[in-house]
Amino acid sequence: MEEVLETMQLENMHCDVCEGTTFQEREGFYYCVECGTQKDQIRAVDITAEDNFDDTAAGRYTARTIRQKKDTEKEDEDDITSWEFYNYVLRGFLQELLNMGAKPELKLMTLQVWAAYLDSMEVAFSKSNKTGLPKLNVRALPIDARIIYNHKTFKKGKKGKKSTLTGDPNDERAKFRLWNRTKRNLDASGYRSHGGASESEGEQSLHLQWSMRARKSLKRHMPLKHLDKHSRDSKGSMSCHSLRPRVKQLHNFDRNIYCLNIIKLYVVLGIALNMVEDDIQLSDLLRFIDEEHLTKRCMLNYLPGNVAAKGKALLKDMELSKMKDKVTNKLLRVNIACMSRFINLSEYQKPNLHSLAERYILELALPPRLLKYVNSLLDLHPPTFFNAMTVHPYPRYEARTMAYILYAMKLLFGLDDLKERNISESAAKINEKLLEVGGDEAPLLFVFTEWMEFVEMRKVIVSHYNQSFARRFGVSTRTGCQVDDILAKEWKEKEQGETFGWMQGSAAMKRQHENLTHIIETMLKDHFGESSKESMEKEHIEFQPSLTPAHSYFNRILLQVSRSDGAKMKITIPDHMKVDHSARNLDPFVLETTELSQYLSQHGLKLRVEELACQEDIQNVGIFRPLTIIRGDGREYRANTEIKTETWISELKRKEKRPDFRFTQPTGTYGARYLKRITMRDARRVQLEINNPFWDVTETPSFLLKLNDNEIPLDSLSSLQTFEEGTMDPLNIPLDLPRRNLEKILNPEGSDRASDQVASDINDEPPSPETLLLQVSNFDCWLLHGYMKRIRRHDKHELRQLFPCSFRWLLETCASTIGIVWEELYEELLIVEVMYHHSIRDWSNHRNYLCIQHNTQEKDIRTLARTYKELW
């Protein structure tokens, strides 16, 4: 009769060949039922107790199953270094960007930038590395030293005395447990040592190799000879020095370059996007990171299956818990500048500012006519983005483009809390008349105040469904919306994490988590009638990545509301939010009133245009500047120990404190001697430009018009011959003679009869049509200039209070649109305004050349212009 063997299923154990989970025990070993393969990691051990412990049969003989550790060789096969880990993650991020619509050339450019970075780090692609092994850098991870050089780290022992047996020394149960544990350890040690090779035979450690920068950094803490001893210490027995200096002990450049983390991947992608001139700019990359389209939550999905199976242990080895996932615009630009300098990048590629301005105008829901006006400003004097103050700075392309849009809105509407209101009121009245005579198809004018209400309400609506959008624009949302956003991310992370099982933990923790979740879900179901997942899915809208988030997200919400299931949504869209302000007419505000006047004349209306100037009561505060504290080196301080408290306090009150932020009037002038010197330099510069054969400045050609078989230069014609009298628009064909009779009158009687005839004609004319008044800007605006460098938080608050409310709102809205603070955008606006208002010498002669003025006696204005000229 054959022996019937019992089968059993071991927890968290499976066959290495067929992945089976059912095993049979034969002579102390376990074999898979499906394929018959022996499981080496487990073994049955018989434990027999002595007679003095227990007289029962169960006490004399016990069968147990012990688990052996996996072979270290198999574990090392699945281990990867930090460079390999981030290489997989970088490939995953790159694929995400390609799915979002990035150029295919981004793949090759990312590889080139990443290879250049690893080459400079002496990790790979290095010709000077003869051994071919990657060299360790500053703050190298222990897993890299263990995998590459088989180097073990020194682990400090626990403080305190060793644990000893406590309680009654004659306790039989304690003695039995001690004997049982010793027996198991002996059996396990014999099983491990059977047939195994010794450590000295199978494992050979190599000396640690450090990069040049790492040796220079570690040399501050120990001599190089002592560092070599640490490099030869394969078992990590030396505990005198740490081979990982603290972060605060490193220089700023070492921290930003040699400490490999997830931010370096964002930097590599940012440089590659700029090199291929992709539509995705740095601000878009930051928004994708903030919206978690690129996040470390999905890192394990980018790794191979055998590597990702380690889960939390792998993330712990990479020390990802100590790294920040979100980055700011300033931090990323600083890291890009450092890496560009590190890999010897020649220069950045300037993106197409015209297409960038078109995208931002669409995002702000502004009319396309504004794009034509902004493009004319860009073409008038194109920016070079050359910064002569710092090395390898990443230019603010997005901020400069947005500054041009802000400057154009400032010219068209004034933004002084009075001019834009008057312009909007006159445009709103004309729109009411246009709706009466033309209906819904009438060409309505752009109203600035209505557009402000639309943009502000759009912020609130989109923020209700997107918490990242709410944080960027500073919109406060309900706690329920924030909880739903957290739950959506947790559910998404759980779905991705369950593939590898790294989030489940132990069985007890899993059961505890399931029980708590079930209790809370039951309470929510009883109280609110729906679970948390049902509530989240009802109000949750999944937004796809977009380069115009506000425009795309709002249209997505409108589409959801228009559907049949949109009635379940708690939010209500007002009717005025369905108005397309980008389709409004902006031509009359740039003095192109021909089409509007013709349309009104067809309906018996007349248009009168009135230009508005800036406010007269604008405060003249001057130029603002932060004061730097100059500390003298040769100062001597003496303490007066005999002074009384009252005397000391009175002296402090009498002492005048110098402010750190002030406004000064531009009244400074140069001395006669220095002014003569700069005048001579300017004359010498002009003479050199004239004598330079490569300096070709041609005058604007004069156009000839043929009138009555005579060729007449266009510049010689008067305005009465080339422009219309009513609107001063250029004529298609110039007049031969002015329409007004300017000859001298020789017959006074004839003149009297002519005047009587004109009077009779006026009396016979029908009554004058209704006149509509349209107020526009005279293209003059207020200026508040100064120096934004090294300005403090309190100074920014003081400066912000001087801005008009409308300008302050538009400044912060435009800054939040591209993900920066308002100070950076205002600094770019100052660069544009100072160039156009103070630096260009003669606008009337700009057809020949644009010359930055050098010989001016206004010292403060010249200093301001020269400072911002270096940033143009």
Swiss-Prot record:
Its main location: nucleus. Residues 73-84 are annotated as: B-linker. One of its GO terms (biological process) is RNA polymerase I preinitiation complex assembly. Pfam families: Rrn7_cyclin_C, Zn_ribbon_RRN7. It comes from the Eukaryota. GO terms for cellular component: nucleolus; RNA polymerase I core factor complex; RNA polymerase transcription factor SL1 complex. InterPro entries: Rrn7_cyclin_C, TAF1B/Rrn7, TF_Rrn7_Zf. GO terms for molecular function: RNA polymerase I core promoter sequence-specific DNA binding; zinc ion binding. Residues 187-206 are annotated as: Disordered. Residues 41-72 are annotated as: B-reader. Zn(2+) binds at C15, C18, C32, C35. A zinc finger (RRN7-type) spans 6-40. Residues 85-312 are annotated as: N-terminal cyclin fold. It is found in: Nucleus, Nucleolus. Keywords: DNA-binding, Metal-binding, Nucleus, Transcription, Transcription regulation, Zinc, Zinc-finger. Although it shares weak sequence similarity with GTF2B/TFIIB, displays a similar subdomain organization as GTF2B/TFIIB, with a N-terminal zinc finger, a connecting region (composed of B-reader and B-linker regions), followed by 2 cyclin folds. Component of RNA polymerase I core factor complex that acts as a GTF2B/TFIIB-like factor and plays a key role in multiple steps during transcription initiation such as pre-initiation complex (PIC) assembly and postpolymerase recruitment events in polymerase I (Pol I) transcription. Binds rDNA promoters and plays a role in Pol I recruitment. Belongs to the RRN7/TAF1B family. This is TATA box-binding protein-associated factor RNA polymerase I subunit B. It comes from Drosophila melanogaster. The lineage of its organism: Eukaryota, Metazoa, Ecdysozoa, Arthropoda, Hexapoda. The gene is TAF1B.
